[in-house]
Amino acid sequence: MTESTGPDLIAADAAIDGIEWNILGQIYRPKQLSERSFSWHATFPPDTFVPPHVHPTQDEYVYVLDGELTLFDGESDHAARPGDLLRMPMGSPHGLFNRSGAPVVCLFWVTPTGRLYDLFVGIDGMAEQTPDAVVALAAEHEVEFLPPPES
């Protein structure tokens, strides 16, 4: 990892090495990476989601820039709109859903970085992002996917 030694500006259209990942149908563009934190710009097309999961070693944050993103906290849904910040402390179950019918744009970050960057590289590189393959790879990278909620 290359860390900046001072203040820095990362342009709106910039991504680390021009990277653009497809993660479960969303588009992620990594913005900043260090041992202490990792941030990425995300676009959630309508009807895409990140299933309920836990980061046992990371705090995760999402700042909504455009659209409406639903946080499922393991018990109930919370609608986040532009300007809202979602905070998911390490060890807390959460899933993120775009049920709005329009794209959602947001900025994510985690602290510390852990192995999340490497997980995204692995998922993006899959020939087919099947649930079983993603869950297995995630387990190797400090992310635990949870069973679907009971109906």
Identify the residue ranges that each predicted region occupies.
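Short acidic-glycine-tyrosine-enriched beta hairpin
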Residues: 11, 75-93
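Conserved short histidine dyad/triad with adjacent acidic residue
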Residues: 24-25, 40-55
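Short beta-strand segments in beta-sandwich/barrel cores
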Residues: 48-50, 67-72, 86
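Glycine- and acidic-residue-biased ligand/ion/polar-headgroup-sensing regions
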Residues: 57-69, 74
